[in-house]
Amino acid sequence: MAKLAVIRIRGRVNVKRPVRDTLAMLRLHRVNHCVIVDDTPSYLGMLQKAKDYITWGEINAETLAKLIRKRGKLIGNKPVTDEYVKEKLGMTIEEFAQKVINGEMSLKDLPNLKPVFRLHPPRGGFKGSKKRSFQEGGALGYRGEKINELIERML
């Protein structure tokens, strides 16, 4: 089962209540926040409902490892370190990321890891408008493997 990275692109002004509730269920309360979800029909329905405010795609293990290493936070706002992952799970961050992508483990298996990754705005900006879909040359909606390039620019 693939993992999807979901990033909130647009703000919270004039957001309809069902979309706002969906974004809250995804824990995307602020712009440039990222969460990792499973590729299941229930999550895909939520993503479709909020597609005018988010972008998503399949994340790879290399990008997930960089995301955890650079932007992962533990409760108490402490950074995730190789030593912490080694102590709790007995493996490196790269091995953990690979197991998460393969579905053998979940991000919840790392104790005290916050589920939301706070990212910077992308270096070089969004290509095109923040109000149009990715297929139309904007920034919103499904972007497949290209989500990895966007996350690299936002780390």
Curated annotation (Swiss-Prot):
InterPro entries, per the entry: Ribo_uL30_ferredoxin-like_sf, Ribosomal_uL30, Ribosomal_uL30_arc, Ribosomal_uL30_CS, Ribosomal_uL30_euk_arc, Ribosomal_uL30_ferredoxin-like
Keywords: Ribonucleoprotein, Ribosomal protein
Hydrolase found in the keyword field: no
SUPFAM superfamilies referenced in this protein's UniProt entry, alphabetically: Ribosomal protein L30p/L7e (SSF55129)
One GO cellular component, as annotated: cytosolic large ribosomal subunit
GO biological process: maturation of LSU-rRNA from tricistronic rRNA transcript (SSU-rRNA, 5.8S rRNA, LSU-rRNA); translation
Pfam families: Ribosomal_L30 (PF00327)
GO molecular function, one term: structural constituent of ribosome
HAMAP family registered for this protein in UniProt: Ribosomal_uL30_A
Assembly, per entry: Part of the 50S ribosomal subunit.
Similarity comment: Belongs to the universal ribosomal protein uL30 family.
Protein name per its UniProtKB record: Large ribosomal subunit protein uL30
Organism annotation: Pyrococcus horikoshii (strain ATCC 700860 / DSM 12428 / JCM 9974 / NBRC 100139 / OT-3)
Gene that encodes the chain: rpl30
